[in-house]
Amino acid sequence: MASVIGFYSLNFGLFISLIIVFFSIKNFRNENIFDDKILSFTFLQFIFVVVSFLGLIISFVNSDFSNETVFNHSHTTIPLFYKITGTWGNHEGSLLLWLLVLTLFILLFLLKSKEQYKRYRILTLLFQQIIIIGFFIFLIKTSNPFSYIFPVPNEGLGLNPILQDPALAIHPPILYLGYVGSSIIFSATLSATSLNYISSKWAKHIKGWVSLSWIFLTLGILLGSIWAYYELGWGGFWFWDPVENVSLMPWLALTTLFHFILILERKLIFTSWVIILSISTFTLSMIGTFLV
């Protein structure tokens, strides 16, 4: 039942995304003030994704092996903590987590940017909704975390023992907070560029998102390094493995971007570099998500 609710919530969330796009385009063209219906629908979108994610967690906790994702990545004897963290210890669950953070961050962006230019807020929302809709469709069509198995197995295959570690259990959510933060920076930069809105005021506004993303990405990489040190036996915290490097690249781009944002906040220069680095950070974050 939890899986069924989760799947339908995912579909309702996609439908709400299309409604948000419709009202956003209408508001962008015709009105001088921000339409509060857009914020309400964005909140509703977030709620549907929360329900969907909770549905997957409940399926893991209850060892619902009619769910293919649960069957492939859980077992009745696994401790409760790892049943919960097993939710994102797989491709489908991790993408659903991505989507959850995406919808949370765009909601926070709208709540925290009320003093910004209306068209800038709406255009940022539209760019972000394109990404969100892409994740909805990808999850529903190709990486459905709620796929059904029949006949229902009595037991699951279990979670990879390497993943049954406290550091790695919290590593993906923290890393994804950094990754997804780069999407807000990306959408906001495209919006500001399109509207010729890049300024010192804008730099001060977006600096918070850059800082937040950098902090989470740094913590995520640090936790992954600690785990690799004692779990994989590489003999060090960093082995220049492709899995490590793929998270390092957006971190380097984000670190550079942060310095350019600090300069832009004081003087209107290096705008081209800010645009290039914003796009690069998000692109590298997407590569890091789908490559690992």
What residue ranges belong to the model's regions?
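Polytopic transmembrane helical bundles with strong interfacial aromatic enrichment
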Residues: M1-V292
